[in-house]
Amino acid sequence: MGGCTSKPSSSVKPNPYAPKDAVLQNDDSTPAHPGKSPVRSSPAVKASPFFPFYTPSPARHRRNKSRDGGGGESKSVTSTPLRQLARAFHPPSPARHIRDVLRRRKEKKEAALPAARQQKEEEEREEVGLDKRFGFSKELQSRIELGEEIGRGHFGYTCSAKFKKGELKDQEVAVKVIPKSKMTSAISIEDVRREVKILRALSGHQNLVQFYDAFEDNANVYIVMELCGGGELLDRILARGGKYSEDDAKAVLIQILNVVAFCHLQGVVHRDLKPENFLYTSKEENSMLKVIDFGLSDFVRPDERLNDIVGSAYYVAPEVLHRSYTTEADVWSIGVIAYILLCGSRPFWARTESGIFRAVLKADPSFDEPPWPSLSFEAKDFVKRLLYKDPRKRMTASQALMHPWIAGYKKIDIPFDILIFKQIKAYLRSSSLRKAALMALSKTLTTDELLYLKAQFAHLAPNKNGLITLDSIRLALATNATEAMKESRIPDFLALLNGLQYKGMDFEEFCAASISVHQHESLDCWEQSIRHAYELFEMNGNRVIVIEELASELGVGSSIPVHTILNDWIRHTDGKLSFLGFVKLLHGVSTRQSLAKTR
Ligand SMILES: Nc1ncnc2c1ncn2[C@@H]1O[C@H](COP(=O)(O)OP(=O)(O)OP(=O)(O)O)[C@@H](O)[C@H]1O
Ligand SMILES: [Ca+2]
Ligand SMILES: [Ca+2]
Ligand SMILES: [Ca+2]
Ligand SMILES: [Ca+2]
């Protein structure tokens, strides 16, 4: 088998931004940190009635509608996941979380090994001692009246319900019931704890399901939230035969991007964005969309990279498979949703999950088949920029809302972008030479880029002299903050911007600080703009530099082979940076950054 389960073939380029050990794991590899990886309920997996979602089962390519209507687990069917959404779709959420698939395979292989069997027995013994107390209220009975089942997932089912008393008396709500019997490892318990913690911490966004309370008894955990009676986005896509007009797709994507930008600013990465996990509040055509199911979500610090492989196969980003990722992985999933909305087909499709992973890693989605040729250039450009395999080139959720395809449709308040912090931090740690190079490059920003930066600058509340300072940033964050920010250590990260404590930053310098070289590089005008930037740099910034200094600038040792390479980056005639050196210097710090990130 290929994809995630075998070594990448030689045509797969090694991931330049991934840590050295972050290549695709092969079948019998163990996760880097078994204790931390979100292995989800392995014994439950075996007992689960779901088939692996990829099982080819040509006879059953119809979606089982009754499943939604509260059918038991046995009603879940496996369908052949065709590329065309219009004809068939795998049952909602049968896509096992990827880790489960990998793990089951591993277990199958290892079952024969006595050592593995012994380990399994140990794990089972461990289960007996698991502490399944969450510290949630035990008062469900007196507070909530449970109604009928309205939805079902891998981990539990959801019922409609009503508050019996209190402020919310008679309010209809939804209760997700997660049986404790399914929590068979410390990790699966931790997952539920985190799901509630994240829901509790994130609040106040109109496209995020409102959390009310969590309860528990001996049998279950109960998550009480706002009732979304309009069904899953997936069902609407299917009902339309999988095709949305551009404007209808925009209306959906704006809501998705808005709430995801919000989550990212709070330091939460969802990790399971797909049409099943967006619900409409009511049956009305233009009712509001809400993101649900934070069961795979995690907090992520601005300078942290995650390494556990979770998500659903069709929506998983390449860097997740490479085990080094952060918030950009969610944006990829939105790209997959956007592609599906616009054409009704999946961008990365295969009959097996390893085939899907291979496609995600290597294949470029097709924009040649109908209806793509009849769609606007902007629509295609938008989707492509969400599906860049290099996450550094990919738009952020906030940037995507500024993309001409969206911006031309509706005036939107652009959410504050967490990327800006990361960029400013890297800038403040750069040498004066690199700052000068960035300043030169920032003179070539396009109108769209400038609009985006203006919006971001405004978020940081510049003072009356037009300067942003650490205090203004702090204030700006405080107005956007939820409890989640503490968990993702955003305030700690701010301390790294202390370079702004006494010296403010004007818009001009902000542009130099915030420009993302990798994103700028992906523009059509890159070639021209980098040449122009070098001319500006020559007039105002270039200076004599020695190899040792350059090596330290780039965060590489100055060993002999490095010396040979760097030699080309310095102009022999006058000892200043050559064009090549200029380009490398601009990219340089991100190399150092990503090295630092993998520590
Ligand atoms: N707030 C809600 N209002 C209405 N229905 C809901 C709500 N939350 C969940 N549901 C329904 O219950 C289903 C399962 O919920 P959820 O996706 O959170 O469970 P899960 O067990 O984590 O699922 P998965 O298998 O996708 O991981 C949803 O797909 C949806 O149909
Ligand atoms: Ca579901
Ligand atoms: Ca779900
Ligand atoms: Ca889930
Ligand atoms: Ca974490």
Curated annotation (Swiss-Prot):
Chain spans, region Disordered: 1-128
Coiled coil: 99-130
Modification(s) after translation: Autophosphorylated.
Protein topology in the membrane: Lipid-anchor
Domain of life: Eukaryota
Swiss-Prot/TrEMBL catalytic activity: L-seryl-[protein] + ATP = O-phospho-L-seryl-[protein] + ADP + H(+); L-threonyl-[protein] + ATP = O-phospho-L-threonyl-[protein] + ADP + H(+)
Keyword Transferase found: yes
Residues binding ATP: I150, G151, R152, G153, H154, F155, G156, Y157, T158, K176
Binding site for Ca(2+) 2: E509
Renumbered residue ranges of the record's region Calmodulin binding (CaMBD): 430-450
Main location per the UniProt record: membrane
Domain Protein kinase: 144-406
Lipidation (N-myristoyl glycine): G2
EC category name: transferase
Domain EF-hand per the UniProt entry, residue ranges: 448-484, 485-520, 521-560, 563-592
Residues given in the record as Ca(2+) 4 binding sites: D574, K576
Subcellular compartments: Membrane
Entry remark concerning the domains of this protein: There are 3 contiguous domains conserved in the CDPK subfamily: a kinase domain, an autoinhibitory (junction) domain and a calmodulin-like domain. The autoinhibitory domain (411-441) inactivates kinase activity under calcium-free conditions.
Name assigned to this protein: CDPK-related kinase 2
Organism field: Arabidopsis thaliana (Mouse-ear cress)
